Every structure is written in structure tokens, then in C-alpha cells.
């Protein structure tokens, strides 16, 4: 939701995905405020746009998903160039991995994510080059990745180690 502005402002994507998954305006507002994604007024405008399908273009871009995740984690809410939020998220993940090498078993994390979120297989670097999204059920899974953003947001609110690294 948000047209061209959403490609530069990942917070719009995060708000849209959270609201789309929660289907409850009050609950979404609470989470958006706790995550400090945007002002209450901006969140209300985004939700009204979603309800009325104004500037509501569905995207199958993994980059937009990463922009939303970057905003939810507090890494980058807006970008000055294409891919900035996604790159910041990648750098933060690499820094986290270096800092917590013994604490994170990435293979187990990816295996679990593949079970819960079909899109995770596309995100995994080892498979991203060979994974094609061309079947209706695959496209549906991509469009339903708001569940992934919601899960990440809930983990951050629950106090999971999602410290700002970028």
C-alpha cells in the first residue's frame, strides 16, 4: 500500500503486511506503535488506503519483503536508493552472525522457516538462484508473506535478540 512511496519507505510495507495479517485495526495499531514504525496518523492513513484498495498494488518482489522486515527490526524504515533497506538488513544479519557464531545454527533456522513459510526457500541464498516462482500456489505463498513479517514483529516485541546492528 502506498504506490511508488512504498518502494522508498519500507515502513509502509511493514504496516500493510501487519494490518493484512492481523485483520484487526486496534491490534495492528498497538503493534505499529510499539515497533515505532510510523506516526499513528500515518498508520491510520495506510490502513484506510488498504481498506479502500487505494494505491494497493500486490508485489511478488522479495526486495519489498526485505524492506518491510528491515523496518520491523528497526534497521531502516526508509531508503534513499533502491535496495538500501535490503542491503542494511543483509549487513545486520552478517554482523549478527559474526557476533553470535556459536549461538545461531542457520541451517536449523532455515529448515524451520521452510516448513512454516514456503517463501523462505526463495530467500535462502543456496536456493535463490534455482528457485522459480511460476506456479499459482507459489505466487500465493509469496503474496501471503505478511505472516513472516508478523512473526518477526512479534519476536521483536517479545524481547527476542533483534538488536539494531546497522
Regions found by a protein language model. Name each.
Residues 16-166:
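A contiguous, well-structured pocket-lining segment that forms one wall/lid of small-molecule binding clefts
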Amino acid at each position: 500500500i502506498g504506490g511508488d512511496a512504498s518502494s522508498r519507505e519500507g515502513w509502509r510495507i511493514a504496516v500493510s503486511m501487519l494490518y493484512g495479517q492481523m485483520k484487526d485495526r486496534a491490534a495492528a495499531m498497538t503493534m505499529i506503535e510499539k515497533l515505532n514504525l510510523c506516526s499513528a496518523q500515518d498508520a491510520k492513513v495506510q490502513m484506510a488506503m488498504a481498506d479502500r484498495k487505494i494505491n494497493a498494488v500486490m508485489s511478488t518482489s522479495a526486495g519489498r519483503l526485505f524492506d518491510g522486515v528491515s523496518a520491523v527490526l528497526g534497521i531502516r524504515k526508509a531508503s534513499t536508493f533502491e535496495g538500501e533497506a535490503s542491503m542494511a538488513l543483509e549487513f545486520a544479519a552478517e554482523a549478527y552472525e559474526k557476533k553470535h557464531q556459536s549461538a545461531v545454527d542457520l541451517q536449523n533456522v532455515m529448515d524451520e522457516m521452510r516448513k512454516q513459510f514456503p517463501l523462505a526457500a526463495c530467500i535462502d541464498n543456496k536456493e535463490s538462484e534455482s528457485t522459480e516462482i511460476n506456479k499459482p500456489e507459489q505466487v500465493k505463498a509469496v503474496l501471503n508473506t505478511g505472516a513472516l513479517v508478523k512473526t518477526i514483529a512479534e519476536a521483536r516485541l517479545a524481547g527476542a535478540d533483534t538488536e539494531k546492528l546497522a
